[in-house]
Amino acid sequence: MTIILTDPVCPVCEFPSNVELHFGGLVCGACAAFFRRTVSLNIRYLCEKKNQCKGKRKNCRACRFDYCVKIAGMKRNLVRQRKNSTNTPMYILNRRKDSGNEEVVRGFVTSTQSKWAQHSRKSSMSPNKEAEKDVSKILKISHGRLLKYYIYQITQGKWVNMNTLNIKSVEEFLEITSIHNKLAAEICKTCPGVDLLDNEDILTIRKYFQFSNVWIESAWNYLMSADKHVQIDDSELDLTLLKFINQVKSTLLVSLSQLKFNTIEFAAFKSICIWKLVYHGTSRAMKIIAQEHYEGVAKALNDYYQTYTSMKKSRYLQF
């Protein structure tokens, strides 16, 4: 008789994993890291269903932490407090400046976002509300400046010579992607609203920036370059990689050539691709930030069409 060994199921997230003893409870490494971070940062999550969420508890951080304590038996007093502020989210540092090391309450809408919502309601009664309507209260930036942020990313020029569609070897591809990944990490630090996200969410959005830089922007630069018809020697390329590059050329590249974007339109397109948030799980806070980026860029693009072009509404709807 054949015995099939399977990984045990974590009692918190209910996923098969390597379960070990962490902080007094038998859980997976991911739930242990979540528990450590929550306790060390003194965070209390709220659940809009009063800790009665069904299904996988990873989707609700309040229920996940509740299961860490009540089901797995993890103990808060076994977690060491952080000795420095390295990798501490900005919203935690700002809260500590205002109220010391008091408990930080977070939920489906963060406390910071609640303050902004209250400020937004007060601003609606202000005589300057027309001047303020083009400013995102959450991102703390105007729609026009938000679009300019993405325009700057594609016009600063230091990525033009790092095009993955022109690579000649796997080594060159790895070198280019490594540089793009570092640039994506730098961009994330200055992206409006990212300072409001947890480290897990920041790592997720960084993946979208990386993919956008490596493939979407490469396709754009390839389309705009004068040497796109030069034959590349692909004899040294890995067959799978070559197949994927050809697929990018036959799909994304063809679509971009048909849309005929100018620089401003492509910047808006790239931002929408980054914040589409389809392929990785995201938190409620991250979805709020994504919606702010989408609405801000869309409004700025609409203003651009109405002010500087004759394309008006038809082009905006096509976009």
Swiss-Prot record:
InterPro entries: NHR-like_dom_sf (IPR035500), Nucl_hrmn_rcpt_lig-bd (IPR000536), Znf_hrmn_rcpt (IPR001628), Znf_NHR/GATA (IPR013088)
GO cellular component: nucleus
Keywords: DNA-binding, Metal-binding, Nucleus, Receptor, Transcription, Transcription regulation, Zinc, Zinc-finger
Occurrences of domain NR LBD (ranges): 130-319
Record has Metal-binding as a keyword: yes
Compartments where located: Nucleus
Chief location bin: nucleus
DNA-binding region of this protein: 7-81
GO MF assignments: DNA-binding transcription factor activity; sequence-specific DNA binding; zinc ion binding
SMART domains: HOLI, ZnF_C4
Top-level taxon of the source organism: Eukaryota
Zn-finger (NR C4-type) residues: 10-31, 47-63
Family the entry assigns: Belongs to the nuclear hormone receptor family.
Function: Orphan nuclear receptor.
Protein's recorded name: Nuclear hormone receptor family member nhr-174
